[in-house]
């Protein structure tokens, strides 16, 4: 290791850690028939605007780890959407990260479906290819509320209007994306793939620890519970979940109300679409 450069050394250490994690999770992978038990490794963020470089890095990491329960984490930047499709077409599992809007989510989901269609057209298997679409939650509330507070300070908004959306935009934004997930993966085009053994690309709720102490620790976990989803929680949220939470399928209801809430926030002067784009740029 001492002869490696900084970036190569970092990658080697990550490979060792992720390989160990994947081996630890392998029994779950086998038990669930490749449904769960995955470990993710991220391509370099310096490649976030490099389609060709991202594909090459994903293939290299996949081959080095040589385990079926690995996901290669790739950001959903405009340049990487084609890379995501190309990597999936090669039969490599992908964790698509840094999704903040329905617009970007739709591109990610369609890239997944297109990749499987391309494999099927070539007579290649679509079984056991797994992917998640990591959709971020709490960061949305944080940036929307900060933007609104700035508007209030500038005299461009009324402080009392905040109660209309306080702690609700992240969940609403996620529900809008989930409604799109249900529509896309119940379509005739995906049904044909499902008959060949294809799995849905599950939405993964990321950043689900509450950043504001006034919120219930498991707020996002409770509100986003639903079928075919994954939730990555920080340790404190896991402890709060174990201590007591009400888990019921709330995610499947309220899509229309979610759209109305986001529209209301926009009318108050908060540029939600622009803020969601800024979150992705900052995340990279």
Annotate each predicted stretch with a short phrase.
Residues 197-284:
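Flexible, acidic glycine-rich loops studded with aromatic residues
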Residues 11-15, 47, 98, 167-171, ...:
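Hydrophobic alpha-helical scaffolding
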Residues 41, 87, 234:
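Residue-level signature of catalytic and energy-coupling elements of molecular machines
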Residues 1-83:
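Active-site beta->alpha loop and helix N-cap motifs at the rims of alpha/beta catalytic domains
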Residues 92-236:
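Catalytic alpha/beta core domains of metabolic enzymes, predominantly
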Residues 70-74, 94-98, 275:
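Short catalytic-loop micro-motif centered on adjacent basic/acidic residues
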Residues 23-30, 63-66, 110-121, 149, ...:
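Generic secondary-structure signature for well-ordered alpha-helical cores
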Residues 66, 86-94:
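Glycine-enriched alpha-helix->loop->beta-strand junction motifs that scaffold or abut catalytic
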């Amino acid at each position: 290791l001492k002869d490696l450069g900084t970036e190569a050394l970092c990658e080697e250490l990550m490979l060792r850690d992720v390989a160990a994690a994947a081996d630890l999770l392998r029994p779950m992978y086998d038990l669930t028939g490749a449904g769960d038990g995955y470990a993710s490794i991220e391509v370099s963020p310096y490649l976030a605007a490099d389609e060709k470089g991202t594909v090459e890095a994903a293939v290299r990491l996949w081959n080095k780890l040589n385990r079926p329960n690995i996901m290669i984490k790739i950001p959903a930047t405009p340049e990487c959407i084609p890379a995501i499709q190309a990597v999936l077409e090669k039969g490599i599992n992908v964790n698509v990260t840094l999704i903040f809007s329905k617009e970007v989510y739709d591109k990610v989901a369609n890239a997944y479906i297109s990749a499987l269609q391309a494999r099927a057209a070539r007579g290649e298997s679509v079984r056991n290819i797994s992917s998640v679409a990591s959709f971020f939650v709490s960061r949305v509330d944080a940036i929307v509320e900060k933007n609104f507070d700035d508007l209030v300070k500038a005299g461009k908004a009324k402080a009392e209007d905040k109660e209309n959306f306080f702690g609700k935009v992240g969940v609403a934004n996620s529900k809008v994306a989930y409604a799109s997930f249900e529509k896309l993966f119940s379509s005739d085009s995906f049904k044909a793939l499902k008959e060949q053994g294809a799995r849905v690309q599950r939405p993964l709720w990321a950043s689900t620890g509450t950043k504001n102490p006034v919120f219930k620790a498991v707020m996002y976990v409770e509100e986003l519970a639903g079928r075919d989803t994954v939730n990555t929680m920080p340790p404190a949220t896991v402890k709060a979940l174990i201590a007591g939470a009400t888990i019921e399928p709330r995610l499947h209801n309220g899509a229309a109300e979610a759209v109305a809430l986001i529209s209301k926030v926009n009318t108050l002067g908060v540029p939600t679409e622009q803020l969601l784009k800024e979150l992705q740029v900052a995340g990279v």
